């Protein structure tokens, strides 16, 4: 299985794309969030990802740097269906609020022909906290991350039958106590890191309910995570970001540490 980082930035970046990614293997692909606009098409094309071939999509929450790109994804899917270039079912997962918003945007913006395709070929699947679904032939359990800004879900995916090896994504906020059961001992944890610890006062990471590299790494170390991927970061120091984040993070996390750039691919298993 591969992790394809389509974007690695926080909301207001200009030198990279907003955080979103695809999990892919021979069984299929699973796309998580869409970033903030139709730049998702450019990122996908550059990464060799064919969006219309993905059948399962997950939207973590309603913030613009996550949901607006997914509206474009939904438009592409319905356009391809209408043109007859693809057939079959597409599935969009999320909690009740984001599913309602995604459908509302489409109903208010799409032309009737696309809405007809949406009604016939797109399933909007509302998931609850702790609910498990089969995606890519694997068990995926969605969970409420406990955000106080906007309702947000993360997920944990079995990498091997029985759940002994897992990948956990805790959205774009620090992992809280309510989600630790899903991350403890995980083979992979995807966790936001807004900036270096020394730069917190400049970037106001805590004010925006985000972590520093040091804090994310301390959390992963405490939970016995094997590999940690840091994303949803500033781009002011983009050219040096990987080097600087790795230098800070390795002081606090003893496992495999990854600070991907946009379009980077990480082999998970």
For each feature predicted by the language model, list its residue ranges:
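Cap/insert and terminal regions of metallo-dependent hydrolase folds
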Residues: 174-263
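Metallo-beta-lactamase
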Residues: 86-151, 160, 258, 262
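Active-site-proximal loop/helix segment associated with metal-binding centers of metalloenzymes
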Residues: 13-15, 126-198
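Active-site metal-binding motif and surrounding structural segment of the metallo-beta-lactamase
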Residues: 38-90
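Conserved beta-strand hairpin/beta-sheet module of binuclear metal-dependent hydrolase folds
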Residues: 1-47, 151-172
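Divalent metal-coordination and catalytic microenvironments
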Residues: 3, 33, 44, 61, ...
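Active-site neighborhood of phospho(di)ester-bond hydrolases with catalytic His/Asp-centered motifs
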Residues: 32-35, 54-61, 65, 69, ...
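Short histidine/acidic/glycine/proline-rich micro-motifs that form metal-
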Residues: 11, 92, 98-99, 233-238
């Amino acid at each position: 299985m591969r992790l394809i980082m389509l974007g690695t930035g926080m909301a207001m970046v200009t030198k990279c794309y907003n955080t979103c990614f695809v999990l892919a293997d021979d069984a299929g692909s699973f796309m998580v969030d869409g970033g903030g606009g139709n730049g998702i098409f450019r990122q996908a094309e550059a990464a060799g990802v064919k969006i219309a071939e993905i059948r399962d999509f997950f939207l973590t929450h309603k913030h613009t740097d996550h949901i607006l790109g997914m509206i474009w994804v939904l438009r592409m899917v319905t356009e391809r269906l209408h043109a007859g270039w693809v057939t079959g079912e597409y599935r969009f997962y999320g909690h009740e609020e984001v599913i309602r918003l995604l459908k509302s945007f489409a109903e208010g913006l799409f032309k009737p022909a696309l809405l007809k395709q949406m009604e016939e070929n797109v399933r909007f699947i509302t998931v609850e906290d702790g609910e498990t679904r089969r995606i890519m032939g694997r068990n995926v359990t969605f969970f409420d991350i406990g955000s106080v800004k906007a309702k947000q879900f993360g997920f944990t995916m079995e990498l091997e039958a029985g759940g002994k090896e897992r990948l956990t994504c805790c959205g774009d906020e620090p992992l809280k106590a309510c989600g630790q059961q899903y991350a403890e001992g995980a083979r992979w944890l995807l966790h936001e890191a807004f900036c270096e610890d020394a730069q917190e006062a400049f970037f106001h990471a805590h004010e925006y309910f985000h972590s520093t590299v040091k804090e994310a790494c301390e959390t992963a170390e405490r939970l016995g995570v094997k590999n940690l991927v840091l994303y949803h970061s500033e781009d002011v120091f983009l050219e040096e970001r990987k080097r600087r984040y790795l230098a800070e993070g390795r002081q606090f996390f003893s496992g495999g540490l990854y600070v991907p750039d946009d379009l980077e691919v990480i082999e998970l298993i």
